[in-house]
């Protein structure tokens, strides 16, 4: 029964129970509102906004300052090598503080050893299966575009970010939960709803500090989050039971969907786990990050439309020689460079490597990180002209040219691919906790971009509206941005 139901009940004023509940609800709501105002972070307590205006991006300072706010430290990139694998600076404690992983509904991120390890193991295992995943990802992309972008050869508009969220939700569902759910609108809406409500809930809850264990029961975003989990259970468990019955007594085959693969690992090890929370965690991680990347790279390509023709030519030439294979994706060097350059200028956030000091830590130059302090690292090297000439300028060929330089000098260019990580490019993190799903995400984005570029002409409706923006440490493209698209009439001559 909701508060509204209680207030509108015919027995509200005659029965003591609903009257008491109603009065308590009103009182508690007022108290929480007052405490939220009292606990609202001041400007001094808020994380500093890192410069993002292109004119201020070029960070040439040799020693950027250490910034502090509240119980947190923002460390310059020069500490990357010390921070990345220091076990006294806890990655998991940082996750728990940032993402409030003990709150019901948010626990999909952090539910016991198996749940944490299996998500990383799944990402690693499926990264080794990319060659087998190309066909289903390509097929699913084609289906999505035909149904949502249409075959219309006249210009028509689509919401850029929303379209990318639905696309990535469908592609990842194909690999994570299989054919049965990847086009199921209920599952897609639940995955997207969980993603959106999770972000909203975390942002709201952080305003309440020590009141979080109470407040989360009443916030609409938290209640919506828990509803997503409840509604997802019959879908996930129904498909999983079908898979189990289908394969009962059969010789085990290698699974191409994460749902069956994880269930198989759990069965072999005798571990009990929550399939629904595991799938929602996978869906959130993939949709939130990869749809953001797709939104940014499509906007960047539209802003630099001189790249469209050479990108199409590269895709056609590579696929004609190598077919739709993992080797073909690796040979698309310009596409890879455009992705990496987009991520260099517009990473998901301007801070990374969030850690909590389990003990006091002294860095090599004497800088002290006190016990309990949350340390984050800036991504300022990505915007430094001493490392990337004319760092504030988007250059789609930047990493192609750097590869050519390495080839000419006999140096290794392994650190220049989209999925590689280094202290100078931390779009996927750095060190042993770098994103394990980046290889899958890289293949997924390339396949989707190949379909889009070869099949459609596209342009931004409003370039100014679609420009890069910041919200605290987050960097994003305006969700109101619209694309104009039309189906190309050219005979591409390539089979997907």
From Swiss-Prot:
Record EC number: 1.-.-.-
One biological process term in Gene Ontology: secondary metabolic process
This protein's name: Cytochrome P450 monooxygenase cle4
Annotated TM spans: 12-34
Enzyme superclass (EC): oxidoreductase
Matching Pfam families: p450
Pathway(s) the chain acts in: Secondary metabolite biosynthesis; terpenoid biosynthesis
Keywords in alphabetical order: Heme, Iron, Membrane, Metal-binding, Monooxygenase, Oxidoreductase, Transmembrane, Transmembrane helix
Alphabetized PROSITE patterns for the sequence: CYTOCHROME_P450 (PS00086)
Signal peptide: none
Annotated positions binding heme: 435
Domain of life: Eukaryota
SUPFAM superfamilies from the UniProt entry: Cytochrome P450
InterPro entries per record: Cyt_P450 (IPR001128), Cyt_P450_CS (IPR017972), Cyt_P450_E_grp-IV (IPR002403), Cyt_P450_sf (IPR036396)
Membrane topology: Single-pass membrane protein
UniProt cofactor(s): heme
GO cellular component: membrane
Record function comment: Cytochrome P450 monooxygenase; part of the cluster A that mediates the biosynthesis of chevalone E and its oxidized derivatives that possess a unique five-membered lactone ring and can synergistically enhance the cytotoxicity of doxorubicin (DOX) in breast cancer cells.
Species of the source: Aspergillus versicolor
